[in-house]
Amino acid sequence: MLQFATAFLAISANVVMTQPNQEYIAPGARVSSNYRDMTIRRLRTHEIGTVPEERMPIHELEIEDLITIIASKVVPELSHSESMSLLSAEAARSRSFKDMAADELDVDGALDLLKAVQSKPETTDMTPTFGVWEESNFDSATVEKLFDSKKNDENESHIKTIVEAYKKFRKEK
């Protein structure tokens, strides 16, 4: 009877060791190629064929693809936080240009225009930039705000030149 119980336990232990729990990944397990292979196998048992990389042999997977697969299946919060950061970045881009400083964003060529006027004030063609500002419904006060971060003694006269030229451009339209 004792031999039967010992044999039964040995067979049971062998079955448990060769067929690990498909739902559980040990938190303290070492990261190794065997652990990676086992993780991918477990992921494949849950959702087979949802991502093209999952159908590839494990040794052909790039590490970035492996991280993406694991992050999207094992830790969905990572994927969610990434999408949330993309949404917040899109919201920041869609804010009104009037609220953004010229250092944050070169608003429709304002800084390029200032550099051009500094180098060749008489020959600089400002109408393309003025056309963009006109389409954005910028008034002369808004145009002045574009240059607030670049205002100093050296640039002040050039900025006044640009603002005055823009006022004249708006009157002509």
Swiss-Prot record:
Residues 1-18 form the signal peptide. It is found in: Secreted; Host cytoplasm; Host nucleus. It comes from the Eukaryota. Induction: Expression is up-regulated during the late plant infection stages. Glycans are attached at N155. Keywords: Glycoprotein, Host cytoplasm, Host nucleus, Secreted, Signal, Virulence. A motif (RxLR-dEER) lies at residues 41-55. Its main location: secreted. GO terms for cellular component: extracellular region; host cell cytoplasm; host cell nucleus. Secreted effector that suppresses pattern-triggered immunity (PTI) in plant host. Belongs to the RxLR effector family. The RxLR-dEER motif acts to carry the protein into the host cell cytoplasm through binding to cell surface phosphatidylinositol-3-phosphate. This is Secreted RxLR effector protein RXLR-C12. It comes from Plasmopara halstedii. The gene is RXLR-C12.
